[in-house]
């Protein structure tokens, strides 16, 4: 199979490129590629006769191919050849440019060019016979020629019919088309072309291997030369590395300068350290009190800060109290006061005054009372236990009586308004006798009554102010002792005690006179064998608050009788409690 005209033109282009690159020893596939990689190379070799013949033949083929329509061939093979040439040029970049073609290994490049020319000569023997059949075969990327524009060829002796008329022999037409397609494929890939391609690849491989061997040999030669030089230098210098004299001097000067600078810096640092230490020692010697002054300063600052913090806390507390809203509405308080005043028929002003008085009284009660000198015989704590022997509970206790209640009001309530005078007030306050129970001397139940002994010892000292006669005082003490003893053993639980107390208060009798009357009644009862106490109910007899109790009473209930009177006001209060309790 012979190559067609388009194939011939493509082959000519490839041959031209190959001859320009390899015969002239230009390292690169093209001038532009070579410029990009290394720049222009100067100097060219003289062209050979084979190259001139190839160029002349390519020009003749191009002139033959020029016509009314120059179809473009398939550029696949052209691209392949260009790629191969570029690969060869990349492998041969380091080859010298001014060498002759005869220096190539085994003189293979001219043979490769000759083989390409031989293939082209064989393909160019009958180009005219295949020109008509290959006119319609265009490049695959180009647009096919229209039917109206294409020349009316006979297609191997068969006239192409018109489109309107169908073909009579379709099988023959299809067979002819298939033959043409296979012919094109055979023309593209012939055994001869494949063999040529294989030979080209082999030549390129040999070229690259030879170039590698040359590079390795050159490197080994250089290494051998370097080793020889090193061995000779070591023999002369004794194994030391060879350095130029100027560089050696410069390095020595640099090392010396660095050592000197290092030593100088160390000296400066040591001198500065010594100076600083000496300066600090001098300052410490000159100012030994700086530390104490500093500590005092900080202490003062801390104290000032604490004072300021305390002041700030006080101000914040006051602000908080001032800014706190009232929990009670003043209007609600006003309405409450008006409602209470209307219910009690009391003006609101009086209600407010009463509230203020009650509040002040409570505050006074909360205040601690001044501690008085205590007798060692008195108990530290006392409790009041009120006893009632008539079986009736008190209607009003002492705590229920207001503080400002007067004695005259109580007497009026009890129906004793005729006693509301000064003597009555005095007698009521003094009506309570001295606590002279003789349980200290004689206690049949074994209960302790040491408090009565102290009260008995106190009573004569008080009566000495009223009487100057010592004999009378002794008699009074004896009578008081005997009366208390008798009343303790034989208590009188009759209801006439209250009447006697009131009558004795009206008569102005003092407590010790009552004790004398009790003694007389007892002696009369013993002599006559009769009870004289019932006959003398109207004359009055007040028995002490404590002695009138059965012997079997609970000892915890005697504490109220064992407490001494602290003042006249307290006696008055207890008297009120006693009188009201008997109602």
From Swiss-Prot:
Disruption phenotype annotation: Defective hindbrain central artery development due to impaired migration and proliferation of central artery cells. Activation of the MAPK and PI3K/AKT pathways is inhibited. Hindbrain arterial and venous network identities are not affected and there is no effect on the Notch or VEGF pathways. Decreased courtship behaviors and reduced spawning success. Reduced levels of gnrh3 in the hypothalamus and telencephalon and reduced levels of oxt and avp in the telencephalon. Reduced levels of lhb, cga, fshb and gnrhr2 in the pituitary.
Signal peptide start-end = 1-28
Its taxonomic placement starts with: Eukaryota, Metazoa, Chordata, Craniata, Vertebrata
Q: Which GO terms describe its biological process?
A: angiogenesis; regulation of sprouting angiogenesis
Q: What does this protein do?
A: Neuroendocrine protein of the granin family that regulates the biogenesis of secretory granules. Required for neurovascular modeling of the hindbrain. Acts in a non-cell autonomous manner and is required for migration and proliferation of central artery endothelial cells. Required for normal courting behavior and spawning.
Q: Which gene encodes it?
A: scg2b
What name goes with this protein?
Secretogranin-2b
Which residues lie within the region annotated Disordered?
123-159, 526-583
The entry sums up its family as follows:
Belongs to the chromogranin/secretogranin protein family.
On whether Cell membrane is a keyword of this UniProt record, the answer is no
Organism, per UniProt?
Danio rerio
Key words of the record: Angiogenesis, Cleavage on pair of basic residues, Secreted, Signal
């Amino acid at each position: 199979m012979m190559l067609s005209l388009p194939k011939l033109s493509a082959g000519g282009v490839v041959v031209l490129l190959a001859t320009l690159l390899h015969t002239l020893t230009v390292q690169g596939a093209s001038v532009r590629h070579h410029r990009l990689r290394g720049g222009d190379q100067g100097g060219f070799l003289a062209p050979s006769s084979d190259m001139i013949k190839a160029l002349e033949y390519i020009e003749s083929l191009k002139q033959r191919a020029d016509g009314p329509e120059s179809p473009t061939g398939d550029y696949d093979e052209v691209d392949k050849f260009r790629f191969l040439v570029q690969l060869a040029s990349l492998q041969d970049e380091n080859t010298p440019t001014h060498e002759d073609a005869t220096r190539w290994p085994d003189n293979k490049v001219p043979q490769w060019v000759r083989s390409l020319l031989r293939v082209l000569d064989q393909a160019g023997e009958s180009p005219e016979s295949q020109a008509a059949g290959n006119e319609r075969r265009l490049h695959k990327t180009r647009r096919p020629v229209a039917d109206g524009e294409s020349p009316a060829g006979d297609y191997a002796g068969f006239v192409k019919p018109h489109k309107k008329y169908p073909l009579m022999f379709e099988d023959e037409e299809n067979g002819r088309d298939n033959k043409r397609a296979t012919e094109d494929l055979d023309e593209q890939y012939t055994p001869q072309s494949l063999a040529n391609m294989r030979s080209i690849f082999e030549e390129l491989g040999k070229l690259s291997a030879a170039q590698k061997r040359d590079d390795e040999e050159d490197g080994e030669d250089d290494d051998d030369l370097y080793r020889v030089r090193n061995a000779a230098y070591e023999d002369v210098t004794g194994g030391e590395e060879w350095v130029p004299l100027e560089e050696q001097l410069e390095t020595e000067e640099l090392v010396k300068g660095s050592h000197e600078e290092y030593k100088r810096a160390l000296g400066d640092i040591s001198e500065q350290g010594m100076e600083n230490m000496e300066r600090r020692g001098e300052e410490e010697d000159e100012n030994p009190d700086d530390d104490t002054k500093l500590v005092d300063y900080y202490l003062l600052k801390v104290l000032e800060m604490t004072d300021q913090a305390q002041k700030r806390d006080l101000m914040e507390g006051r602000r908080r109290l001032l800014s706190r809203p009232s929990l009670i509405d003043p209007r609600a308080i006003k309405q409450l006061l008006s409602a209470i005043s209307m219910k009690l028929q009391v003006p609101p002003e009086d209600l407010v005054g009463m509230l203020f008085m009650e509040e002040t009284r409570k505050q006074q009660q909360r205040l601690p009372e001044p501690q008085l000198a205590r007798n060692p015989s008195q108990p530290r704590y006392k409790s009041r236990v009120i006893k009632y022997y008539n079986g009736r509970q008190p209607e009003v206790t002492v705590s229920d009586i207001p503080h400002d209640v007067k004695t005259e009001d109580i007497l009026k309530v009890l129906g004793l308004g005729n006693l509301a005078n000064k003597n009555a007030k005095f007698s009521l306050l003094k009506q309570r006798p001295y606590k002279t129970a003789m349980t200290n001397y004689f206690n049949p139940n074994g209960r302790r009554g040491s408090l009565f002994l102290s009260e008995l010892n106190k009573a004569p000292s008080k009566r000495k102010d009223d009487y100057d006669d010592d004999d009378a005082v002794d008699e009074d003490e004896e009578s008081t002792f005997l009366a208390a003893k008798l009343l303790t053993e034989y208590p009188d639980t009759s209801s006439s005690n209250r009447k006697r107390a009131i009558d004795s208060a009206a008569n102005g009798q003092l407590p010790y006179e009552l004790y004398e009357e009790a003694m007389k009644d007892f002696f009369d009862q013993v002599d006559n064998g009769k009870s004289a106490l019932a006959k003398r109910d109207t004359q009055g007899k007040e028995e002490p608050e404590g002695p009138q109790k059965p012997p079997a009473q609970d000892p915890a209930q005697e504490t109220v009788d064992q407490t001494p009177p602290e003042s006249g006001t307290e006696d008055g209060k207890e008297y009120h409690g006693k009188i009201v309790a008997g109602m």
